[in-house]
Amino acid sequence: KTKLRLLLLLFFIGGLIILPQKANADEVEAVPVSISVKYGQTEARTILDMINEARTNSEHAWYWNKDDTTKTFCTDLKELEYDYDLERVAMKRAAEIALSYDHERPIGGYAWDTYGQENIRYGHAGENIAAAQTTASQVNFCWREDNEPYGGQGHRRNMLSSKFNCVGIGHVYYNGVHYWVEEFAYRPEINTTEVPANDSTQAVSVS
């Protein structure tokens, strides 16, 4: 019996040695993935005028209330300014959603984490994402959600929110699909220093 117990003990010890252990998520290092995308920032920037037209047009600046029978009309909305820091975030996020179409980033966390990585100060923030629309006007029409009920107008409410004073927009073409991102925010200091629109094809590290 003593020998049997010893054999069993050795078996269990051996089993404990070879059993795989689950690693904690915060112990796993994200492995960067490099993808080649084609940016389309010249066209992406044209969406700013479309947003501001909706914000300042009394016929367009509305959204459904939760009862889906009455509307909230957004009066006296100011035009959004284009923020080139937010554009940088939107471009990064556009590449990320090409890998994982979600507001959660491929490496975990959310879009707002990118703001911190880019040292962007902000108050309120919101994000719209879209895929497959080939032109700026098409994606803007989808985000407007004119014919959707309250539950389907989240993108529209971002576009018409009085909490935001600026926006940056990103557009990439990857693996045959167009991806679009709008980053809205309230910023005490908006970066309006224009940079050349990036319409190049380049390798992007998503990490």
Please provide the spans of the model-predicted regions:
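Short, compositionally biased P/S/T/A/G/V-rich stretches that sit at domain boundaries
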Residues: 186-206
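Bacterial N-terminal signal peptides that target proteins for export
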Residues: 1-8
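Hydrophobic core
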Residues: 12-17, 55
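A well-ordered secondary-structure block
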Residues: 92-96, 103-188
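Short, well-ordered surface patches within globular domains
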Residues: 26-118, 156, 162-167
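Sec-dependent signal peptide cleavage junction
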Residues: 17-27
